[in-house]
Amino acid sequence: MCTSPAAETASEEDSPGKETRSTVTLVQSPPGGRCVYPRLEPPEYFKTERQQSALDRNLKNYHGTVGAVALDQDGNLAAATSTGGYTGKLPGRIGDSPLIGAGTYADNRACAVSGTGLGEAFIRAAVAYDTAARMRYRGASLASAARAALRNVARLGGDGGLIAVDRRGNVAMPFNSEGMYRGSIDRRGKTTIAVF
């Protein structure tokens, strides 16, 4: 609903001999049919210091990423990583999840990797690619390559973890954070689920 800038005042007779005044606001749509709300508050109006402090505490060590790696019956490797979403993110920030080689990477000659953690450190260390490169060019095992790549994240002041599978079906899930929800299932159906 929109109000006209010019409001009319009307007089009414409530009882004989007594006059009361009431204000009547005319409602109309401005040209083009768009409404302008003079009291629409900016988003900052609704944010309190207490709410922001609680959000900051909750997000401090929360990475909110989900990832998957897979080896199919034909020997193809795949990796997928999804970020924790838009809430609380800085405008213009690019995380590691969508960057191939940082938070996600798959190479049929080596391994598939999905990572979660401090995105800036994962980007600078190209963690997912580094894991595969250590296997291809140095002959490192999956577990050794993943741990070494994660050490580079720590050197940059970051924390996080990886899930990875190589072309032989070996799985590695190292992390240097307090914990990381993770699980795997092998070709025989054996499952592994862990947090710490």
What are these regions (language model features)?
Residues 1-196:
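N-terminal nucleophile
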